[in-house]
Amino acid sequence: TGASAHPRIPTWVADLRVPGVVLHSSEYLYPRQVLTSDVLIVGGGNSGVQLARELAPSHAVTLAVRTPRRHQPAARYLRRQFLARGPRPEPVFEDSYEQLRDAGVRICPAVAKAGKSSVTFVDGTVTTPSSVILATGFDPGDDWLPDSARIDPPQRAMTGIPGLFVAGIPQYGGRGSDTIAGVWRDATAIARRIIERP
């Protein structure tokens, strides 16, 4: 269970055949796993940027980025994350895209679809990667919850089942719930609701 329990795999991956590997970032350990000379990394968040930086010295790296991310110091983000409202892309704390370009990384837009051996980006350009790493994030491990537990709109730590609360999953608690620093808000809300129950 948790906010990052299941690797998120794009549906187009099922149509793709490459001579090398197709890995989710959760399966990646070191550059030697990617035996081919080139690699497409899908996802421009922190994991994708870190992988691009690590693989750039030994591979021809293409980084597919769906949403441009702001680059900022982690400390500034941590101060502001709790004040943020609404869904926004997480900022990138590692190298900027410009630094990656300087390291030889090719930055491309998001992947639209895949054919047998090729990938088409949303701008219509096509590449034929030898290997692919999916830095596409995770889905929460809330599949153990019955459908009746999900409420819309979500309320901090609440479910649709009286007496059942959820902590640590942003879909139930809000931005930052999946961090040590942020889960306290879920715990506080749960404690308050338990105390206030008749």
Question: What feature does the model see in each segment?
Answer:
Residues T1-P198:
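Flavin (primarily FAD) cofactor-binding/catalytic cores of flavoenzymes
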